[in-house]
Swiss-Prot record:
GO terms for cellular component: plasma membrane. It comes from the Bacteria. Residues 124-502 form the Protein kinase domain. Keywords: ATP-binding, Cell inner membrane, Cell membrane, Kinase, Membrane, Nucleotide-binding, Transferase, Transmembrane, Transmembrane helix, Ubiquinone biosynthesis. Its EC number is 2.7.-.-. This is Probable protein kinase UbiB. One of its GO terms (biological process) is ubiquinone biosynthetic process. ATP binds at residues 130-138, 153. Pathway: Cofactor biosynthesis; ubiquinone biosynthesis [regulation]. Its main location: membrane.
Length: 546
């Protein structure tokens, strides 16, 4: 490690200890050398003894800076790893940092523009940022070509070396987790860190975010439920993104929404519909739908429309995952735990040799108490969490796409019930799920599949005779190969039988010659000839096997 890395590591451990986070490590794991080392190098009393553990962890991550803040935010979605009191505190982490100098942002923009001055493309460029976060900040301007109001998102200068340095240290700490925590191996800390690193590096590429926003906008074009601002791809690069400026009420500002007469029930239900439409119709969902990224249009409060921004993190499910997920939800709310267990096995989420009866019993034990509440109060997100936690005990592998989905579902639920506490998520989602499943089976699905595949088969039809001929030829060649292999195996089997026979004769001759040589020396050369014959017979047998 370099001196700089050592200083940073010292600061990280010093910060953790100053917040008393060493109590996360069981005393039995703190061996005497570790305790002495801790006292000598990192002595620091817990300065926040009056605060609960979750709060202290949140404050420590905030003190360590943006990379750790975002890491904590990601960990808050992994409720399979942490108890609720810690996960809830991590969810409060705010990705707000001091903005960097506007002139420096202007230089970054001009660099992304190939050295052109800002006023070559933009008018009314604001040096003061509109918003600032750990990865990027946003400035307002107008497009010179058409006068439209836009926002320019620009990556922080020199953020990549900072991320790489801190990620290296996070990896080092992750390697210690299995040694320090009794359940550390099950938590798969290095896998969690790899997942975070990928998400973080994806956010550094604004071309990826631009493409995500364009796709989401296309999926909801002319939709009354969701509006996605227009992206101007000709102005975008890896370090800069230009998109339409929007005006709306933050979805968390319930007072402002009520003041303008927003239909809160419809708004909450539309949030659920938007989510399930993204997941099941489009297989492409916005996976960072926290309140800071969602606004509500000022127009038509009686028929409210969401506005979604910041598409840096998206998720997708394949057809099989969607089907299993929809059937899992329906089976769960029908309290058909056997079906839930079978679906987990059939999907490959748990190993195929899982004992279905034991798995069903475990699911029933964990999930049945949930139905003590009315259906309207049951949380979809916590249903998924309970299912995944139970499945993890049966060696369920981490499914990154399902983790993203669960996180997004928790956001959607939280926002929906904040807007309209009586929101019945199941009542809103059930018709959608049942309709989607019905659409995937039967005659309509068959006709749609035929339509989708028809161009492919029409294009390949002239090749069919040749493909049939090639298949027949390959079949003949395969049969010839099989016959040859069978013949070779038969010959080898015969030779092995002969070899065993010769080895037996050789052994008898050697043994007989040896006994005669010892007990009948008067027989002269006969014992020697017998032993020589035995050796020759062994050699012939050995040659037949080779």
């Amino acid at each position: 490690m370099t001196p700089g890395e050592l200083r940073r590591l010292y600061f990280i451990i010093h910060t953790f200890l100053s917040y008393g986070l060493d109590e996360l490590i069981p005393k039995i794991r703190l061996t005497l050398p570790l305790r002495i080392w801790r006292r000598m190098l990192f002595w620091m009393p817990n300065r926040h003894q009056d605060q609960p553990l979750g709060t202290r962890l949140r404050l420590a991550l905030q003190e360590l800076g943006p990379v750790w803040i975002k890491f904590g935010q990601m960990l808050s979605t992994r409720r399979d790893l942490f108890p609720p009191h810690i996960a809830d505190q991590l969810a409060l982490l705010q990705d707000r940092v001091a903005p960097f100098e506007g002139k420096l942002a202007q230089q970054q923009i001009e660099k992304a523009m190939g050295g052109l001055p800002v006023d070559a493309w933009f008018d009314d460029f604001s040096v003061e940022p509109l918003a600032s976060a750990s990865i990027a900040q946003v400035h307002t301007a107008r497009l010179k070509e058409n006068g439209k109001e836009v926002v320019i998102k620009v990556i922080r200068p020199d953020i990549l070396p900072i991320i790489k340095a801190d990620m290296k240290l996070i990896y080092r700490l992750a390697r210690w987790v299995p040694r320090l925590l009794p359940d550390g191996r099950r938590l798969r800390p290095q896998e969690v860190v790899r997942e975070y690193e990928k998400t973080l590096l994806d956010e550094l590429n604004l071309l990826r975010e631009s493409a995500n926003a364009i796709q989401l906008r296309r999926n909801f074009e002319d939709s009354p439920m969701l509006y996605v601002p227009e992206v101007y791809p000709d102005y975008c690069s890896e370090s800069m993104m230009v998109m339409e400026r929007i005006y709306g009420i933050p979805v968390s500002d319930v007072e402002a929404l009520e003041a303008q007469g927003t239909n809160m029930q419809l708004l909450a239900e539309r949030g659920v519909q938007v989510f399930f439409t993204q997941v099941f119709r489009d297989s492409f969902f916005h996976a960072d739908m926290h309140p800071g990224n969602i606004f509500v249009s000022y127009e038509h409060p009686e028929d409210p429309q969401y506005i979604g921004i910041d598409c840096g993190i998206v998720g997708s499910l394949n057809k099989e995952d969607k089907r299993y997920l929809a059937e899992n939800f329906i089976a769960f709310f029908n309290r058909d735990y056997r079906k839930v267990a079978e679906l987990h096995v059939d999907s490959g989420w748990v190993p195929p040799d899982t004992n279905v009866e034991e798995f069903e019993f475990a699911i029933r034990t964990v999930c049945e108490p949930i139905f003590e509440k009315p259906l309207a109060e049951i949380s979809f997100g916590h249903v998924l969490l309970n299912l995944f936690n139970t499945a993890r005990r049966f060696n369920m592998e981490v499914q990154p796409q399902l983790v993203l989905l669960q996180k997004t579902l928790l956001y959607v639920e939280g926002v929906g019930r904040q807007l309209y506490p009586q929101l019945d998520l199941w009542k809103t989602a059930k018709p959608f799920l049942e309709s989607w499943i019905k659409d995937q089976v039967g005659i309509p699905a068959l006709v749609r599949a035929f339509k989708d595949k028809a161009p492919f088969w029409i294009e390949r039809m002239p090749e069919i005779p040749e493909l049939v001929y090639q298949s027949l030829q390959q079949s003949k060649q395969l049969q010839t190969s099989v016959d040859t292999i069978v013949r070779d195996m038969h010959v080898r089997h015969v030779r092995q039988g002969q070899s065993r026979y010769l080895f037996g004769i050789g052994a008898v001759l050697l043994l007989s010659g040896t006994l005669l040589f010892i007990h009948r020396p008067e027989w002269g050369m006969m014992p020697g000839w017998l032993m020589a014959g035995g050796v020759v017979t062994w050699l012939i047998g050995w040659r037949k096997t080779h």
